[in-house]
C-alpha cells in the first residue's frame, strides 16, 4: 500500500489550508500541523456549544454505519404556544446518540464561534477559495459512514482529539460527477493511515475514503472543504439570485434588463476582488451569507 506520510510540518492550520489551495495536490497526503487553541475542538468544547444552545438541528446530523438518525432522536420536546420546535436540540438526546455509537457531524461552527469565524475570514481571503468547516465527533471503535467520495476540490482533515484510522481507495473514475454515488470497491484500497492529534490528511476531489475511530477514546476532527470559485461561477450565482428575487409579474424586458445590468456591473469590476468578497462573505459579521446571493 502507498505511504501517505510526508515530512512536511505546517506552522498553523491557516498555512495548511492556504498551501493546499495554492498547490492543488493531485494525490492524498498526510503531514503534521500545529493546532492552536482556537482550532482545538474537543468533545468538551462541543459540550459547551451544546449546553449553550448554540447548535441547532439545522447545523448537525448523526450517522452510524451510514444510517442517519431521525430528527425525533435529537430534537427537544420544548413547546411554544402548544407547538413543538423541532429545530431545538435536546442535549440529553444528543449525548445518548453519541453514547450509542452515532457520529455527530456539525456544520458551520463559525456561525456561533467567534474565534473560528475570525480565522475562517482570514484564511478565505488568503487562499481566495471558499471554505466549508465541519466537526466530526465519533465514539471509540465506531464508524459513521461507509466508503464514499466527496465533491469538494479538497477535503483537509485535522485531528484534534483521539485517533482515527483512514482508508484511502482509488482516484475518481473517468467521467465521475458529484451525482454519481457509486462507492469505491473494497479491493481498490490503496493506503491506510492513523491520524493522531496534530496529524492532517489532504484528500483531493472524488478520491475514495472511509474512516473509523480507534478504540482508545472518542475521536474529534475538523474537516475543511476547500473549493475554488471561478469568476464565471460567481456571475452565474448572482444572476440566479437576481432572477429569483424578481416579482412574478416581471416582464421579459425587465428580466433582460436585470441580466444585462449584472453582466455590465461584473465586467466593470475587478473579478479577483469580487471572488474575495464572495468567499469571505459568510464570515463577515452582518454581511449576506452565500445562500442569500
Regions found by a protein language model. Give the residues of each.
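Fe(II)/2-oxoglutarate
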Residues: 1-15, 22-27, 182-194, 210-293
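An N-terminal JmjN-like helical accessory module and its immediate linker preceding a catalytic domain
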Residues: 1-62, 66-69
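Hydrophobic alpha-helical hairpins/lids featuring a short glycine-rich hinge
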Residues: 78-137
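Short, conserved beta-strand element in jelly-roll/cupin
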Residues: 136-140, 151-172
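Short, conserved secondary-structure segments in the cores of folded domains
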Residues: 145, 154-155, 191
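Conserved metal-binding segment of the jelly-roll/cupin
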Residues: 160, 193-212
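A short beta-strand-loop-beta hairpin characteristic of the jelly-roll/cupin
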Residues: 163-197
Amino acid at each position: 500500500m502507498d505511504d501517505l506520510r510526508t515530512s512536511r510540518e505546517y506552522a498553523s492550520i491557516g498555512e495548511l489550508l492556504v498551501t493546499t489551495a495554492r498547490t492543488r495536490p493531485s494525490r492524498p497526503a498526510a503531514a503534521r500541523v500545529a493546532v492552536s487553541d482556537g482550532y482545538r475542538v474537543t468533545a468538551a468544547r462541543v459540550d459547551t456549544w451544546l449546553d449553550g444552545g448554540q447548535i441547532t438541528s439545522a447545523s448537525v446530523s448523526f450517522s452510524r454505519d451510514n444510517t442517519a438518525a431521525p430528527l425525533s432522536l435529537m430534537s427537544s420536546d420544548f413547546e411554544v404556544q402548544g407547538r413543538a420546535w423541532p429545530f431545538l436540540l435536546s442535549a440529553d438526546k444528543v449525548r445518548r446518540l453519541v453514547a450509542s455509537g452515532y457520529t455527530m457531524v456539525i456544520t458551520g461552527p463559525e456561525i456561533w464561534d467567534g474565534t473560528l469565524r475570525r480565522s475562517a475570514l482570514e484564511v478565505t481571503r488568503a487562499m481566495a477559495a471558499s471554505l466549508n468547516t465541519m466537526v466530526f465527533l465519533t465514539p471509540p471503535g465506531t464508524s459513521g459512514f461507509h466508503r464514499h467520495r466527496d465533491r469538494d476540490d479538497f477535503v483537509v482533515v485535522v485531528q484534534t482529539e483521539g485517533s482515527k484510522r483512514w482508508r484511502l481507495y482509488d482516484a475518481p473514475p473517468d467521467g465521475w460527477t458529484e451525482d454519481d454515488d457509486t462507492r469505491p470497491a473494497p479491493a481498490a484500497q490503496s493506503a491506510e493511515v492513523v491520524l493522531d492529534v496534530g496529524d492532517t490528511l489532504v484528500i483531493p476531489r472524488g478520491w475514495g475514503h472511509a474512516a473509523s475511530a480507534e478504540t482508545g477514546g472518542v475521536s474529534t476532527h475538523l474537516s475543511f472543504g476547500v473549493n475554488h470559485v471561478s469568476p464565471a461561477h460567481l456571475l452565474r450565482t448572482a444572476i440566479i439570485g437576481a432572477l429569483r428575487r424578481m416579482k412574478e409579474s416581471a416582464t421579459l424586458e425587465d428580466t433582460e434588463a436585470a441580466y444585462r445590468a449584472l453582466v455590465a456591473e461584473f465586467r466593470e469590476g475587478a473579478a479577483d476582488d469580487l471572488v474575495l468578497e464572495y468567499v469571505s462573505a459568510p464570515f463577515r459579521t452582518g454581511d449576506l451569507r452565500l445562500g442569500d446571493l
